[in-house]
Amino acid sequence: MRSDKYSQLVSVVNAGLGACGTSATLVYIRNNARVAPTGDIITLPARLDGPPIPAEYILEAMTSLLSIRTAWLRIQNTGQAVIVAGCSTQNFHHGDVTWEPPASTVTLTTAKSLWVSASAVREMKVIQRIRTAPLAAMMFMCFYRGGKNEVTVRFAFYKSDSEPNLLKISKCVYEAIDAEATRNLPKPRGFDTPPCAVLAQRMRPLGAAEGGDRETSAQTHSPAAQAQHVMQHATATKSWGALGRTLKHKKNLGWILFTCALSLAAAFVTAYIK
């Protein structure tokens, strides 16, 4: 069966969950063909007291690949485990809670769900005066045990390591997309890349996205090569910048040496003529 946008979504999300000890799976399969669902699209089990989950990354992947206006994450406390589901719409039930900034922690009782939207993430960035560009500083979710089977959900933005994290995650995503494209190459209709290109544009590091001094071509470079080119370009830019600063500081010394050499040459010519 040809890979569709939902299979691509799972590949991209799992590439970002590689360090979280969990993986996402598709929910809706009907007549061996995945269709656009109205409820949960993907689900993944979360580890209590475990590594944080990149919530904003999952939301942006759903928004880009599925072309939906607002993506939602539903965090459900089953009493035995925590299940995170990606949804295209909010199916609010009695007792559910919607995350509203600026709250950084939410406590969930048994059989209750917490809804997190992509728009709420952007609102939280505005409140905390964080750059609102997608994935400029990724929002993560951590889950901790509480009393009486309660679960505490904590939201945090990691700013200091955002650029290295983006490079690592985007490289994993690009490799997953390349591998998927290679597997589907012999098939007549090929691999549907435009949504992935949108996600790649969203995940491009800030220095490359705002520089405007180069253009990348998807027809001549693979996405993995683009990520490597970005890192090489950043290193070269820093090296040339350091060289320029060194030459600027030594400009006056160069003029002094040039003047001395000219004086010595004039004295030598005068002595030779005499």
UniProtKB/Swiss-Prot annotation:
InterPro entries: Herpesvirus_viron_egress-type. It comes from the Viruses. It is a single-pass membrane protein. Phosphorylated. The keyword DNA damage does not apply. The keyword Transmembrane applies. Forms a heterohexameric complex with NEC1. This is Nuclear egress protein 2. It comes from Psittacid herpesvirus 1 (isolate Amazon parrot/-/97-0001/1997). The gene is NEC2.
